[in-house]
A protein has these predicted regions:
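A short, aliphatic-rich alpha-helical micro-motif
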Residues: 47-49
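Conserved active-site segments centered on acidic
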Residues: 2-45
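Structural signal for conserved beta-strand scaffold positions within catalytic alpha/beta enzyme cores
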Residues: 40, 56, 77-79
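Ser/Thr/Gly-rich flexible loops in soluble cytosolic domains mediating phosphotransfer, phosphorylation
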Residues: 74-103
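Short, conserved catalytic or adaptor-binding loops enriched in Gly and charged residues
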Residues: 66-71
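Glycine/Thr-rich phosphate-binding loops of Rossmann-like dinucleotide-binding domains
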Residues: 17, 63-64, 87
Length: 103
């Protein structure tokens, strides 16, 4: 990997589920030897964040569609199960390859 990926985990309050998703994603990153900067925030803060990938629960999709997030700069991954390492890996790895964070 040529550069460190910046991942942002988002939930309503920026505390519970976003932190749980962050912990599950750390396992996936470690397993795949991916270096990343991780943070978790509430949904209102996420709109103005400068990150490579936002990871959030599927139930926030309608709210994110209202934000003006540049898809060229930031990919958004919606999860059905925010603590499923399998789902995180299945959705995150292709995005990282597409965005040239992985070969």
């Amino acid at each position: 990997m040529s550069k460190q990926v910046k991942l942002l985990f988002v939930c309503g309050a920026g505390l519970g589920s976003s932190f749980a998703a962050q912990m599950a994603t750390e396992e996936v990153l470690n397993k795949n030897n991916i270096k990343a900067k991780l943070d978790h925030v509430d949904i209102s803060t996420a709109a103005s964040s400068n990150v490579d990938v936002i990871i959030t629960a599927q139930n926030f999709q309608k709210q994110f569609e209202k934000f003006n997030i540049d898809s060229e700069k930031t990919s958004i991954i919606y999860l059905k199960n925010i603590v499923s390492e399998k789902e995180i890996e299945e959705k995150l790895i292709p995005v990282l390859k597409e965005r040239k964070f992985l070969d």
